[in-house]
Amino acid sequence: MKKLTIGSAVYDDFEGVYFTYQSLRLNTQDIWEDLEFIVVDNNPESVEGKAVKQFCEASQQVRYIPYVEKRSTAIRNEIFKNSESKFCMSIDPHVLFEPATIHKLIAFFDLHPETNNLYHGPMLYDQIKGHDPCSNMKPEWRDNMFGTWGYDKRGNNPYGNPFEIEMHGLGMFACRTEAWLGFNENFRGFGGEEGYIHKKFKKAGHTTICLPFLRWLHRFQRPRGVQYPLITEERIRNYAIGHKELGWDDKEMREHFKSKHPKIDVDKIIDDLECT
């Protein structure tokens, strides 16, 4: 069995996939035997999807899995379902790591082989140095999303001890493969997962941990525009599904989306869901 699967769900982001996985492979050549790479393509018939497939095949190492049953960022579940490793890490297909980060992560998991916790690391901004990395997210609503970037001084020192956090962005997260609790299979489109999956682990008696050494860069810029559809009604529905599953009070969620989208019947979307 491999030690770690690293995988991404992708929708028309060939360049992200190429540079992310080539960077990973270049920096881990001495431990390839411990690693598995997976790309789950949610738009495999597009020009970019076909290019992603060709790259994965040419790499002779990255496993390509087309997935068209639904369009959703929650298809990251498929990374864990298809993993053949003891541990699994999901990353956005436009994330980069510092040298030796993957080695350190494997060493950490070797010391905690039966952990059921969910793991994150500090996110760096483009300048890399000279700022406080985002070590967590704060549980608050802003701009149609639950969670705003937060900072904890304990995340500034990459040699520091792991510490508990409430939630984080899902550009990168990891856990023991069999411990993955999964995103709700009814999620569609984009959104609804931050906070939800962390609460799900907490309700199961587990913890979300920030590993200060697990530092990552995320490309936010999209000069060609966002390639996947962003449908507000789908996002509201996802949050409603998650709130219902976890038994959360949805008052704050309703108020947020009503204030942002007065022309959308937010209550109907949520209440119709409750009747299904």
Spell out what each predicted region is.
Residues L4-D13, T20, N27, V40, ...:
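A conserved hydrophobic helix/loop-capping motif in glycosyltransferases and polysaccharide synthases
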Residues V39-V52:
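A conserved acidic beta->alpha catalytic loop
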Residues C88:
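Short aromatic/hydrophobic "clamp" motif used to bind/position activated sugar donors
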